[in-house]
């Protein structure tokens, strides 16, 4: 079945011409099957909604891809942006990342994929010029810079153009005011998100905007899934073991009350909890990693100390 599918003329031609990438070290990267499928789902959604103008500018024109951490989301999402920019009728493709993710190495990688697409400056002036330039069909920007541009340019011509906006790591940072700004100003848009940790109703927690609490509410349908279970099965990521440790004990003197949610960040970062978790890790490190006595925390410290004195 693999050879019949892989070596089919149209499949092999697509892989060679559309789904291969050279990185900054001139290394040839061939996209994996799940990456190709996710890309095709997005391109198909763009094509369908372009032929149905009622879908443009709505959630039905977009969607999100759930690919686990370590499965190559950034390559998939950027290659999707590159191919989308080549589609007839698409004016602009914006590949949006968080500021903290746009380091020098990442910029080199993006620039390798699309020369001149990425701008690492803090100024929105370059972004404004890129958006106004009809020859600049694909660009990489940050969430923060795009938000600043929208705030300063209320009547920009790009808002009326056919735009594809792709978010890499579409977690909570895209919710709220940023999402509202995009959907309010852009008229003919497709909104796509890539995430390894989608937010569902049962893990959404509290938020100011009840209509944007989940990933689906912000981006639309789930277009493709490749979870950690799939990645471990395919040996694309290392397997791991999870031990659940009880950190909260019920007390009889407290009466249960129904609340919408708790202050999770405060609970997670409480000094007492952090201290207990840290001590547990140190105390059980050798046991969990199956190290010998000589490599225990105490043994390592003593041996290192002696070697320094020697």
Each predicted region: which residue ranges?
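Short glycine-/polar-rich loops that comprise or flank the Walker A/P-loop
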Residues: 89-91, 136, 161-162, 186-190, ...
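Conserved RecA-like ASCE P-loop NTPase motor core of nucleic-acid helicases/translocases
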Residues: 66-67, 91-99, 296-310
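SF2 helicase catalytic motif II
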Residues: 156-192
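Conserved helicase motor
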Residues: 97-100, 120-129, 143-148
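Conserved helicase ATPase motor motifs in RecA-like P-loop NTPase domains
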Residues: 68-69, 171-173, 185-204, 235
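Conserved nucleotide-binding/hydrolysis micro-motifs of P-loop NTPases
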Residues: 100-102, 144-147, 171-172, 196-201, ...
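ATP-dependent helicase/translocase motor core
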Residues: 1-94, 101, 105-116, 134-137, ...
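Interdomain helical connector at the RecA1-RecA2 junction of SF1/SF2 helicase-like NTPases
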Residues: 204-306
